[in-house]
Amino acid sequence: MEKKRDLRLVKQRLKALEKLQVDVKYLDDIPELYEEYRRHKLPKYQFTARCVRTGALFIAYGREKSVTNAALFLLTLHEHFKRYGIRLEGSVVQTDNGTEFTAPWNSNKVTIFTKLVERCWGAHHHRIPPGAKTYQSDVESSHRWIEEELYAAETFASEQEFLQKAAQYQKWFNCSRYNRYKGNTPLNLVRETYPALPEEAVVFPPVILDNLLVQYKAELAQWAT
């Protein structure tokens, strides 16, 4: 109990969006979703970023679990935050050691994901110790909730409807869903750092990242060098 209380205090000292946990969720292993996933050729992966201080949730989808899609997720998030004056310099982006985020252990290469965190965001990429899943508890909790409250609870007649319902869920989660552990909605907690921030700042309509490659190809190349 003491350790949990200490961890809560550490999180409460953070500013909004000062630390984000980023992870990927598989969608093809959800029994209630599988038939619609197969029939409508829905994306296989959910790319997730969750703010440790506020619980704010940001998601996008990918057909591939690739470093390119992870980088596109960062670019679109950065673009969105910048639009509302949210500064990411000095923040921490935490991930596991998956190859969509990091190079293999025996490689000295730096991935485009890490380069974007450091150069575009001006942030720090923190990798958790191998196998230390509890380090990602905030984002893992959101994966459990979205599976129960969206993917297993709703029906989807098309890819378009899937994205529409995902957008509705993301808006509800950030603007209306009260988090008992954190004591408020994510939107109100973000406003403790950014007073008078419009609701739209935490509304991030999900997209399929693979479809953005042509649009962002030049920008990705710029940050990769």
Give short role names for the model-derived ranges:
Residues 2-13, 18, 123, 145-225:
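C-terminal domain-tail junction helix/linker
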Residues 19, 47:
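Short glycine-aspartate micro-motif
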Residues 24-46, 52-164:
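RNase H-like DDE/DDD metal-dependent nuclease/strand-transfer catalytic core used by mobile genetic elements
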